[in-house]
């Protein structure tokens, strides 16, 4: 029975970590005025009839802090890349010079920064709720396992400690992202 409780605890830790990873991935999608190649992770380009991730078709580099340079390994892809970037919801018009596609990220206005910070706070709150739901699920499972009262209390405390640790990490990541937005 104690092994089952340990397995439940390990499962909860995995779920909480996954919730945080999703939040961090979503944080990467929030533009801060600085160029971040991760913003192109979900972009696919039609390459010989198959949708292929842009990052596998081109070298992506940051220059001047606010500019992404996309240099495709096959220069015939430039029109396709430009078309896909225009259709994406990046809100940036790509520029080309024949060999390289450039994305210049403008500095966000004060109003836009506040809106982005609000979005960061909402993502963080959703993640905290997800972690609390995982905690509740874990508490219910532990209570169903036939353990002594002392062991049950021990595992419930472990779950609470794990929850607190993850909530603190979320707050730390949120503060970091908001600081990044303020500096933009």
Curated annotation (Swiss-Prot):
InterPro entries: Ribosome_recyc_fac (IPR002661), Ribosome_recyc_fac_dom (IPR023584), RRF_sf (IPR036191). It comes from Onion yellows phytoplasma (strain OY-M). Belongs to the RRF family. This is Ribosome-recycling factor. Responsible for the release of ribosomes from messenger RNA at the termination of protein biosynthesis. May increase the efficiency of translation by recycling ribosomes from one round of translation to another. Coiled coil: none annotated. Keywords: Cytoplasm, Protein biosynthesis. It holds the Pfam family RRF. It is found in: Cytoplasm. It comes from the Bacteria. GO terms for molecular function: ribosomal large subunit binding. The keyword Mitochondrion does not apply. The lineage of its organism: Bacteria, Bacillati, Mycoplasmatota, Mollicutes, Acholeplasmatales. HAMAP family: RRF. One of its GO terms (cellular component) is cytoplasm.
């Amino acid at each position: 029975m104690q092994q089952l409780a340990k397995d439940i605890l390990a499962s909860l830790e995995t779920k909480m970590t996954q919730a945080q990873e999703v939040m961090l991935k979503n944080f990467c999608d929030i533009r801060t005025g600085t160029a971040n190649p991760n913003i192109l992770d979900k972009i696919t380009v039609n390459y010989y009839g198959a949708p292929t991730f842009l990052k596998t078709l081109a070298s992506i580099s940051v220059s001047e802090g606010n500019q992404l340079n996309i240099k495709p390994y096959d220069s015939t892809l430039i029109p396709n890349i430009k078309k896909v970037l225009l259709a994406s919801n990046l809100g940036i018009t790509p520029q080309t010079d024949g060999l390289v596609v450039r994305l210049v990220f403008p500095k966000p206005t004060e109003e836009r920064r506040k809106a982005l910070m609000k979005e960061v706070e909402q993502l963080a709150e959703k993640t905290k709720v997800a972690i609390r739901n995982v905690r509740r699920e874990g508490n219910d499972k532990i209570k169903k396992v036939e353990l002594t009262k002392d062991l049950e209390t021990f595992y419930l405390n472990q779950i609470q400690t794990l929850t607190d640790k993850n909530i603190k990490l979320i707050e730390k990541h949120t503060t970091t992202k908001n600081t990044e937005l303020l500096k933009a």
